[in-house]
Amino acid sequence: MNFLPIFLDIHDRNCVVAGGGEVAARKVAMLLRAGAHVTVVAPRLCSELLEQLNEQSREGKLAYRAETFQDEHLADAVLVIAATDDFAVNQRISEAAKRLRIPVNVVDNPGLCSFIMPSIVDRTPVVVAVSSGGASPVLTRLLRARLETMIPMAYGRLAAYAGEFRDRVKHRFSQPAQRRRFWERVLQGPFAEMVFAGKDQAAKAWLERELENETEEPVKGEVYLVGAGPGDPELLTFRAMRLMQQADVVVYDRLVSPEILDMLRRDTPRIYAGKERNRHTMPQESINDLLVRLAKEGKRVLRLKGGDPFIFGRGGEEIETLAGHGIPFEVVPGITAANGAASYAGIPLTHRDYAQSCIFVTGHLKDGSVDLDWPMLARPKQTIVVYMGLLGLTVLCKQLIAHGLPNNTPAAIVQQGTTRKQRVLAATLETLPELTAAAHLVPPTLVIVGEVVNLHRKLAWFQPEGNLPGAE
C-alpha cells in the first residue's frame, strides 16, 4: 500500500479550508458532515459557500476569514485542505502545515499532500472509502459508483441497530466466537431483511426474542477444506470467499499465493503448514492432528490449499482423519493447477484433433528416478500433465522417449501459472530440459506433454510482463 487508510475523528475539532470556490465548498460540506468546526480562508466566496455560511455560522460550525492565507490561520487546526487555484499559495499552505505537523491535503496535487481524500460511500455509521492513491481519480469514481449500487442505503440503519444491541450481546455471550457467530446469523437472516424492507420495529422485536431464546451452548468446531486455485485470486469460488471470511483460524500451504492470503480477515490467526522438497515445515501427520485439535477447541478451521485439495493435495488423508474423530467438515473444490495454468498458457488439455484423453501424474523424484507407468504414458493421442515435475524433468523426458514417444513430441513447462509471474517455455521432449535449466525456472511449475502444446503459439492470450524472452 502507498497510503495507510484510516478514519479520523474530527468531531468538534477545527479544520481549515483555504479557497472560496466550488471545490472548496464540496470539501467544507464533507467536513461538516463529519462533525468538524470549519474555518474557510479566502478573499471571496462562491455562492454555494455563502449559502453554507448562512446556514452553519449561527450554529458555530462554520467560520469565515476574508483574507489571504497566513500561517497564523493554522494555529489550532487539526487538518488542512488547500483548494485555491494558485499553485504557489497551495505550496505555501502545504509547507506550513507539514512544518507544524498538521495533516494537509492539496486538491489535485498528491505531491504536496500528507494525506489524500478517498471517494466515499456513506451509509453512516458504515462508511466505505475507495482510493487509487491519486493514480486514477476516474477509476476511483467508477468503483465508488459500482459500490453505491451494491450496498443498500438501509445498511446504515442495520449497523445502527446492531450498535444498540452490542453491549447486550456482549453480556449475553461470554466467548468472542459465540458473539461473532450470533451476529453473522442475525445480520444475514430475517433481522436484516426486515430492516431492508423498512420494518424496523419488527426487526428490533425479532432481535429481542433471539437474545432471550439463544442459549450459550459450547461452540462446535468444524473444518473447511478449501481449494485456493492456482494463484489468481479471481479464480476463487464464491463459496471459498465466503468461508475465508468466516473462519476463526487458517492453516495454509506454500502454494497459496500472497494475493489470496491478503483476502483473509486481518484478525484471523494464520498457521503455515507448507511443504518443500526435503524440508517439511510440518509433517502431514502433524497437520492432521492440528486440524483435529483446533476443531475440538470449537474453532471454524479453514484448511486452505493451492489448486484443488483432492488432486495431489492430500486432502483425502486429512478428511479421513477428521471423519475418524467425528469432526464436521466440508470440501470446496478449487481450480486445479492443470486447468488453470494450461488455460492461461493457451494449451487446451483435450482437443478433437490431437488428444482424446488427459492424464495427471506427479513427477516427484525418489532416489534419482520417477516411478510412473511409462508404457501407459507413452501412448499417442493423449495429453500428460505432470505436477511437481521440475526437478525430475530430465528423467521424465528421457523415459517418455525411451518408451516410444518421438523425441520431437511437443512439451511445455509453465511456472507460477495464472499469476503476473507466469512464464511459459514451449519446446520438445528432447530440448525442454536444457532450455528449462538455462531459463532458471523455479517451482511451482507444471509440465504438459502432447500435440496440444503446439496450439500455445496460436492461443496464448495471457502475456504478463517479464515473460521468458523468446518463450512461446
Curated annotation (Swiss-Prot):
- Superkingdom: Bacteria
Q: Where is this region: Precorrin-2 dehydrogenase /sirohydrochlorin ferrochelatase?
A: 1-207
Name the chemical reaction catalysed here. uroporphyrinogen III + 2 S-adenosyl-L-methionine = precorrin-2 + 2 S-adenosyl-L-homocysteine + H(+); precorrin-2 + NAD(+) = sirohydrochlorin + NADH + 2 H(+); siroheme + 2 H(+) = sirohydrochlorin + Fe(2+)
User: Biological process (GO) annotations?
Assistant: cobalamin biosynthetic process; methylation; siroheme biosynthetic process
Q: Which UniProt keywords apply?
A: Cobalamin biosynthesis, Lyase, Methyltransferase, Multifunctional enzyme, NAD, Oxidoreductase, Phosphoprotein, Porphyrin biosynthesis, S-adenosyl-L-methionine, Transferase
Question: Where does this protein act, in terms of pathway?
Answer: Cofactor biosynthesis; adenosylcobalamin biosynthesis; precorrin-2 from uroporphyrinogen III: step 1/1; Cofactor biosynthesis; adenosylcobalamin biosynthesis; sirohydrochlorin from precorrin-2: step 1/1; Porphyrin-containing compound metabolism; siroheme biosynthesis; precorrin-2 from uroporphyrinogen III: step 1/1; Porphyrin-containing compound metabolism; siroheme biosynthesis; siroheme from sirohydrochlorin: step 1/1
Enzyme Commission number(s): 2.1.1.107, 1.3.1.76, 4.99.1.4
What CDD domains does the entry give? Answer: SUMT
> Which parts of the sequence bind NAD(+)?
E22, V23, P43, R44
Q: Which Pfam families match?
A: CysG_dimeriser (PF10414), NAD_binding_7 (PF13241), Sirohm_synth_M (PF14824), TP_methylase (PF00590)
Where is the stretch described as Uroporphyrinogen-III C-methyltransferase? Answer: 221-472
Q: Which residues bind S-adenosyl-L-methionine?
A: P230, G306, G307, D308, I311, T336, A337, M388, G417
Output the InterPro entries linked to this UniProt entry. Answer: 4pyrrol_Mease (IPR000878), 4pyrrol_Methylase_sf (IPR035996), 4pyrrole_Mease_sub1 (IPR014777), 4pyrrole_Mease_sub2 (IPR014776), CobA/CysG_C (IPR006366), NAD(P)-bd_dom_sf (IPR036291), Siro_Cobalamin_biosynth (IPR050161), Sirohaem_synt_dimer_dom_sf (IPR037115)
PANTHER family listed in its UniProt record: SIROHEME SYNTHASE, SIROHEME SYNTHASE-RELATED
Q: Which family does it belong to?
A: In the N-terminal section; belongs to the precorrin-2 dehydrogenase / sirohydrochlorin ferrochelatase family.
Protein's job:
Then it catalyzes the NAD-dependent ring dehydrogenation of precorrin-2 to yield sirohydrochlorin. Finally, it catalyzes the ferrochelation of sirohydrochlorin to yield siroheme.
Q: What is the name listed in the Swiss-Prot or TrEMBL entry for this protein?
A: Siroheme synthase
Species lineage: Bacteria, Pseudomonadati, Pseudomonadota, Betaproteobacteria, Nitrosomonadales
